[in-house]
C-alpha cells in the first residue's frame, strides 16, 4: 500500500480502538482489561509512528491538510502527545468503566486538537 493508504489504515485502527473504549465507557460493552489494554496500545503505537507516514510528496489525495507539512514540528508534537498520553494510560491501566471514560477524555482531546488543525473537513 502507498503512504496515504497506510496512514489512513493507521487512523482507522485508532478510530476502531477509540470505538472499543467508547463502548466500554458508555456501558454498551462490559469492562474488559485486555480490550482496554489492546485499544490503548494500538493508539499509542500508531500515534508514535504517524510523523513518518507523511513524507513530502503525499500532500494530496487524502484528508491530510497542507498545514501538516507547513507546521511539521507542531504536527509531530501533537502526535507525540497522543503517544505519551497513551503510555500514561497504559502505565495506570483503568480498572473500571469510569476509568476508561476518564482516559477517553484525554485521548479524545488529543485526537480532536490534531484533527481540528490537520484534517481537512469533509
From Swiss-Prot:
InterPro entries: Cyt_c/b562, Cyt_c_II, Cyt_c_prime, Cyt_c_prime_subgr. GO terms for cellular component: periplasmic space. It comes from the Bacteria. The keyword Iron applies. Keywords: Electron transport, Heme, Iron, Metal-binding, Transport. Heme binds at residues 11, 111, 114-115. GO terms for biological process: electron transport chain. Binds 1 heme c group covalently per subunit. Heme c binds at residues 11, 111, 114-115. The keyword Iron applies. GO terms for molecular function: electron transfer activity; heme binding; iron ion binding. Monomer. Low-spin monoheme cytochrome c. This is Cytochrome c-556.
Amino acid at each position: 500500500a502507498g503512504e496515504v493508504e497506510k496512514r489512513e489504515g493507521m487512523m482507522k485502527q485508532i478510530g476502531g480502538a477509540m470505538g472499543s473504549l467508547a463502548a466500554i465507557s458508555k456501558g454498551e460493552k462490559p469492562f474488559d482489561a485486555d480490550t482496554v489494554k489492546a485499544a490503548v496500545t494500538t493508539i499509542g503505537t500508531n500515534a508514535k509512528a504517524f510523523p513518518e507516514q507523511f513524507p513530502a510528496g503525499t500532500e494530496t489525495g487524502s484528508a491530510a491538510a497542507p498545514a501538516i507539512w507547513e507546521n511539521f514540528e507542531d504536527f509531530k508534537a501533537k502526535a507525540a502527545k497522543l503517544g505519551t498520553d497513551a503510555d500514561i494510560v497504559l502505565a495506570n491501566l483503568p480498572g473500571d468503566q469510569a476509568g476508561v471514560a476518564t482516559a477517553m477524555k484525554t485521548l479524545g482531546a488529543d485526537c480532536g486538537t490534531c484533527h481540528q488543525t490537520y484534517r481537512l473537513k469533509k
